[in-house]
Amino acid sequence: MKKGKILIVAAHPDDEILGCGGTILKLKEKNDINVIFMTNGVSARGKNKISEKRRKNACLKLFRYLDIPKPEFFNFPDNQLDKTPLLKIIKKIEKKINLYKPDTIFTHYSNCLNIDHRKTFEAVNTACRPINKISVKKILSFEIPSSTDWALFHGKNFQPNYYVDISKFLNEKINL
């Protein structure tokens, strides 16, 4: 992958590491990387503000370790992106794209079991439609096996057609 600006759009904190953590480790040396999270990842589990703060602090600590800019949290309700107007989600993503001007976006696979993953994919693809001059040249999906492997009735299984060799970073990714 050529040097450029990468935007990772993930539904929840930790999706970016599970889905493309090794790729982040490899590409951060020669690329600018920004990450946005659509939700806090805890509110649907009946967790309280302490759990949310703990998860956010762990996320920020990881980003300091990775030496990439702090992520942006959009704070939509967890596991409820299907109840949020799609246009509202799209406009937040479009604003980030217009400010950051990424060349490449990594996001969820379209047929994940998790509704937030599917809606994130849909919003990213809609935000990148070619109606205006847009910076995004490539949209790549990542897999989160716990979500894609259980999506039996949501269409095709994840079938990657783009690979990043992360063999030099595999042990570090596992330890993230």
Tell what function each PLM region has.
Residues I8-I17:
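Short, glycine-rich nucleotide/cofactor-binding loops
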Residues L18-I36:
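Histidine-anchored nucleotide/phosphate-binding helix
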